Design a protein with these regions (language model features):
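Membrane-interface transmembrane helices that cradle and orient dolichyl/undecaprenyl
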Residues: 26-29, 67-80, 199-200
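Loop-to-helix entry region of an early transmembrane alpha helix in multi-pass inner-membrane enzymes
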Residues: 2-19, 36, 52-53, 128-138
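Aromatic/glycine/proline-enriched transmembrane-helix motif characteristic
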Residues: 104-176, 245, 251
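Membrane-embedded helix bundles of polyisoprenyl
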Residues: 11, 22, 34-73, 82-88, ...
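Alpha-helical transmembrane segments of multi-pass membrane proteins
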Residues: 12-15, 60-70, 166, 186, ...
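Transmembrane helical bundles and short interhelical boundary loops of multi-pass, membrane-embedded
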Residues: 92, 96-116, 166-170, 199-255
Length: 255
């Protein structure tokens, strides 16, 4: 894609995101080595580079606000952290809606626009009009149920709980929301790396999620992948379950 001002600013922000995520890792682990490794990896992360530097999609404009919010949470500033994340969500919704409006489709014929979401498993071309209307309500119901459970159990929201919630939400939302584009996993790509730096036993999460994202990009560009997209959808479901179980155990134990 042509290099313009938006693209150049996005590239600068991508490096800023790498520095910010390094600071987040240092805040969580106290390890300068892990913080530097996080920066070094994100500076060459394939899907991050492809999103801005090559493809000019520039999700970084709202994604960096998500991670700024996470950093503020890790430093004990919940109010500013929440505000930063909400600002990122508003920009993300606007960007995705604008992208939908540019598509030359009179009415959606598929619940998938590149990201291997849940509808790959149940049939992305079946009952489109039905799922189109209720899928967001189902997603909202899941989120509200989680909030109610946390409130009912009086779970103490620690730094680690916030990080687990962050990654869980980053995988959950694009997985159950319809019409998600190929770059819908951008936030979870980065969050999974931070998750691994905090809990090294989960080293496979960033690796697997990066494979899914890269395959989604390949499918969007070439119209095909080495494996059926449903395989990546099942893989995402397994990762979502893994992080969800981690979150549940941490909440029960109060970690």
């Amino acid at each position: 894609t042509p290099t313009d001002t938006w693209k150049l600013c996005a590239v600068v922000l991508e490096f800023a995101l790498a520095v910010l995520c390094g600071a987040i890792v240092h805040s969580y682990t106290g390890s300068r080595l892990r913080a530097f490794l996080t920066y070094a990896i994100l500076a060459i992360y394939p899907t991050v580079v492809a999103n801005g530097s090559l493809w000019n999609i520039n999700c970084i404009y709202y994604v960096i606000l998500f991670f700024l919010g996470l950093y503020l949470y890790s430093r004990g500033n919940a109010l500013l952290g929440t505000g930063s994340i909400l600002a990122g969500l508003l920009i993300a919704v606007f960007r995705v809606r604008s992208w939908w409006m540019t598509l030359d489709v009179a009415y959606p014929v598929s619940l998938n626009r590149g990201w291997p979401n849940f509808y790959e498993i149940i049939g992305k071309n079946a009952f489109v009009e039905l799922y189109d209307k209720v899928s967001l309500l189902i997603l909202a119901g899941m989120i509200l149920t989680g909030i109610y459970w946390f409130a009912d159990k009086k779970v103490k929201v620690t730094k680690d709980i916030v990080l687990r919630l962050f990654l869980f939400a980053a995988i959950l939302v694009p997985y159950f929301a319809p019409y998600m584009p190929a770059w819908a996993g951008y936030t979870a790509d980065v969050a999974a790396l931070i998750y691994f730096m905090r809990w090294p036993k989960r080293f496979y999460l960033p690796m697997l999620h990066l494979i899914v994202s890269y395959s989604a990009y390949a499918y969007a560009i070439n119209g095909e992948t080495k494996l059926p997209m449903v395989v990546f959808s099942v893989l995402l479901l397994a990762m979502l379950t893994n992080v969800g179980v981690d979150l549940y155990h941490a909440a029960v134990k109060g970690e």
